[in-house]
Design a protein with these regions (language model features):
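Alpha-helical segments in soluble extracytoplasmic regions
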Residues: 54, 58-65
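N-terminal prepro-regions of secreted/extracellular proteins
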Residues: 8, 29-30
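Acidic/histidine-rich, surface-exposed loop or edge segments in extracytoplasmic proteins
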Residues: 33-45, 107
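Sec-dependent N-terminal signal peptides
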Residues: 4-15
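An amphipathic, aromatic/His-enriched active-site/gating alpha helix that lines ligand/cofactor pockets
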Residues: 23-29, 64-75, 86-93, 97-142
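Sec/Tat signal peptide C-region and signal peptidase I cleavage site
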Residues: 17-21
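Short, surface-exposed ligand-recognition loops at beta-strand->loop->(often short) alpha-helix junctions
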Residues: 46-55
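Thioredoxin-like thiol-disulfide oxidoreductase module
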Residues: 78-84
Length: 145
């Protein structure tokens, strides 16, 4: 009977430690992101589009945030296919990431009122993106470092 009692106490102890350790597990929900956050756009080049046109849109996109005093980075990438250790020479897709310093800054930006000039400037770079690319993927991202 004493052995059964000790086994029961041991089982309760291990269960308690297991429950408490799970309680302190870090959350990886987007709303708990502690690093920089971003909007990721993956695009395909239109037949009539050019990398030069895409780069022009990226430049205006960056200027849009800078002109409004925001510390936001617009990063653009050209993706290339890989075949084993070799990289193909032709662009595969284009990627744009709009990086905000924090979730709080992104939220403040998203909840602000757009002026007529804001909308005009926004439409200007979006039109250039749309003339050169088609967005196929939209994601929100959290940088862990």
């Amino acid at each position: 009977m004493k052995t059964l009692k000790y086994l029961f106490l041991l089982l309760i102890t291990f269960t308690s430690f297991s429950v408490f350790s799970a309680h302190h597990e870090k959350s990886y929900n987007f709303s708990d992101c502690e690093g920089e956050v971003g909007n990721l756009y993956v695009s395909e080049m239109l037949e009539s589009g050019t990398v030069k046109g895409f780069k022009k849109a990226v430049k205006l996109h960056q200027k849009f945030y800078k002109d409004r005093g925001l510390d936001v980075q617009v990063k653009a990438n050209i993706e290339y296919e890989r075949d084993g250790n070799e990289t193909t020479d032709q662009p595969s897709r284009l990627t744009t990431v709009v990086v905000f310093p924090s979730l709080k800054v992104q939220g403040l930006w998203q909840n602000r009122e757009f002026t007529e000039q804001d909308q005009k400037d926004f439409n200007a770079f979006v039109e250039i993106y749309n003339a050169n690319t088609k967005v196929t993927v939209r994601k929100s991202i959290c940088y862990l470092n």
